[in-house]
Amino acid sequence: MAKNDKINFSTPSGFPEFLPSEKRLELYLLDTIRRVYESYGFTPIETPAVERLEVLQAKGNQGDNIIYGLEPILPPNRQAEKDKSGDTGSEARALKFDQTVPLAAYIARHLNDLTFPFARYQMDVVFRGERAKDGRFRQFRQCDIDVVGREKLSLLYDAQMPAIITEIFEAVNIGDFVIRINNRKVLTGFFQSLNISETQIKSCISIIDNLEKIGEAKVKLELEKEGINPEQTQKIIDFVKIDGSVDDVLDKLKHLSQTLPESEQFNLGVSELETVITGVRNLGVPDKRFCIDLAIARGLNYYTGTVYETTLIGHEALGSICSGGRYEELVGTFIGEKMPGVGISIGLTRLISRLLKAGILNTLPPTPAQVVVVNMQDELMPTYLKVSQQLRQAGLNVITNFEKRQLGKQFQAADKQGIRFCVIIGADEAAAQKSSLKDLQSGEQVEVALADLAEEIKRRLT
């Protein structure tokens, strides 16, 4: 590199990095999510960031996602090794774009080592060639859970998902939210009753999934472009706009099933939906936390039954903050047997970005430390180290200032980091086994015996 060449240290577009205050918020949310996942018996796994490209693209799983391929970058004197790197053809590698396809590959690799139903959680970073813009990232963390069965999987696992979503978002206190539930069989069965072809049904579901985003008028235009006639289009719009309480919607669907021709798929979907709703209620989820929304379709083609989207009440423009559903064939296609599954995903990076911008969440102080032991004189460092260790052993997070600076500057540095307490020990205090405890939050300063220091700080923290 020439002397005058300057390195561009800006992050690549779409690849976020966090200040300590932001990273601590992410860790807090990750810990909360993990605790809830584990309370339901989900076990952690980790899959490689890199998968074989043929795995990621198998059975059309790539969808519309742009995959980041990997190719080794060799120094000029090693270019001859490039053809031997094994990164072409079936050995081509790429970064994973979600965690569902890698889960399917993971189960295929470890089928005989796992117990089914297999309930796992994974909170990893994934990569997509998204158009980088506000709230959209090319690298982001997803917090996923899935339950996968062999041959069959109880619908009560579907019912468990809203209970888990409710516990997580109530724990992080982000305000009122609602989990919108539907069943793809209800939609498919209704479209079949209108004599819409299977190929058209897939397109219709994707279009309906965008109803909230693009509006009714554009949905009608898109449906008509797919060859849906005006009468069918209006019936579809009227159907997905059915609303009311959960019981009202179920009653309307049951009544409708009596009038629909070829309604076997529709009836099965309504029955599954009712089973899931009953399970959600039995798990103690309040009715205010969920509803049936017939416009929720989840555009991904691998969903076959229950689908979910979660929105913040009053902040619907933020979009879904947690979504998922049931799939019958996604995992099984890798293995050659029926392996139904159900899961949800929280796109944590995007969620944090949106909630911070909306003022719904605030960052945490940049350090977990609650206490600073200030440096009054270097000769007392043995005392400072001993006191710091005693406070840590009592369960407090402590920084010891090893460099001596003006006391005011030490206070300023502690306050800037959001640290509440400063422990001040001069020669006289050390001789008397006492300290001055300064509360930077209130400005109060009190004398405390060293033997009582930990308990006094903990008392003030509660």
Curated annotation (Swiss-Prot):
| Protein name per the record | Histidine--tRNA ligase
| Record's subcellular location | Cytoplasm
Record carries keyword Cytoplasm: yes
**GO biological process terms on file:** histidyl-tRNA aminoacylation
Enzyme class, top EC level, equals: ligase
Q: Which organism is it from?
A: Nostoc sp. (strain PCC 7120 / SAG 25.82 / UTEX 2576)
Per its record, what are the GO molecular function terms? ATP binding; histidine-tRNA ligase activity
| This protein's UniProt keywords | Aminoacyl-tRNA synthetase, ATP-binding, Cytoplasm, Ligase, Nucleotide-binding, Protein biosynthesis
Which Gene Ontology cellular-component terms appear in the entry? cytoplasm
Q: What is its EC number?
A: 6.1.1.21
A family per Pfam = HGTP_anticodon
Q: Which reaction does it catalyse?
A: tRNA(His) + L-histidine + ATP = L-histidyl-tRNA(His) + AMP + diphosphate + H(+)
- What does the subunit comment say? Homodimer.
Write out the similarity annotation: Belongs to the class-II aminoacyl-tRNA synthetase family.
